[in-house]
């Protein structure tokens, strides 16, 4: 029973931390005047997805083989976040790699959603602006967050009983 409770607390901690990270992003946006670029919005969405997966894990909390789909969803969402954060860091390090484009709102009016997503993931000139906290660019912090929270989530779901 103690091991089950410990793993459940890990998922609860994952849920709280991902929600706090998104709340912190809103604080940076409105209080520190750091408007998000399209890739920042996608990264917030990935943290939201991790929150949703953690909530499903808390409510359903599968055992045995049932925990593997939950671990897969957590791992896949964390990996997606890592890839997007690395892409964002690449764009910030190489601002010439992106070109000026239309805003996602305008694209959404004319293109199918998957093409809009591909355009967002390719980056815009808005994504080249480097906003840093404690000297580290924000995508660097999100990269650390995805790695740490992905590891926490996988440990909470897959840890073996002692």
From Swiss-Prot:
It is found in: Cell inner membrane. It is a multi-pass membrane protein. The chain crosses the membrane at residues 11-27, 46-62, 69-86, 141-159. Its main location: membrane. Residues 1-10, 63-68, 160-162 are cytoplasmic. Gene3D superfamilies: DsbB-like. SUPFAM superfamilies: DsbB-like (SSF158442). Signal peptide: none annotated. Residues 28-45, 87-140 are periplasmic. Keywords: Cell inner membrane, Cell membrane, Chaperone, Disulfide bond, Electron transport, Membrane, Oxidoreductase, Redox-active center, Transmembrane, Transmembrane helix, Transport. InterPro entries: DiS_bond_form_DsbB/BdbC (IPR003752), Disulphide_bond_form_DsbB (IPR022920), DsbB (IPR050183), DsbB-like_sf (IPR023380). Disulfide bonds join 37-40, 100-127. GO terms for molecular function: electron transfer activity; protein-disulfide reductase activity. GO terms for cellular component: plasma membrane. GO terms for biological process: protein folding. Pfam families: DsbB. Belongs to the DsbB family. Required for disulfide bond formation in some periplasmic proteins. Acts by oxidizing the DsbA protein. This is Disulfide bond formation protein B. It comes from Alkalilimnicola ehrlichii (strain ATCC BAA-1101 / DSM 17681 / MLHE-1).
């Amino acid at each position: 029973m103690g091991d089950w409770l410990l793993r459940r607390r890990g998922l609860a901690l994952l849920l709280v931390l991902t929600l706090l990270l998104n709340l912190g992003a809103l604080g940076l946006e409105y209080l520190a005047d750091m408007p998000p670029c399209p890739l920042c919005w996608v990264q917030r969405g990935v943290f939201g997805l991790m929150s949703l997966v953690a909530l499903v894990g808390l409510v359903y909390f599968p055992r045995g083989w049932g925990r593997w789909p939950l671990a897969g969803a957590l791992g896949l969402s964390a990996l997606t976040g890592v890839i997007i954060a690395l892409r964002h860091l690449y764009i910030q390090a190489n601002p010439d790699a992106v070109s000026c484009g239309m805003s996602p709102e305008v694209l959404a009016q004319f293109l199918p959603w998957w093409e809009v997503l591909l355009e967002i993931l390719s980056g815009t000139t808005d994504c080249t602006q480097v906003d840093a906290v404690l000297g580290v660019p924000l995508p660097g912090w999100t990269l650390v967050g995805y790695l740490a929270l992905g590891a926490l989530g996988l440990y909470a779901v897959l840890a073996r009983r002692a």
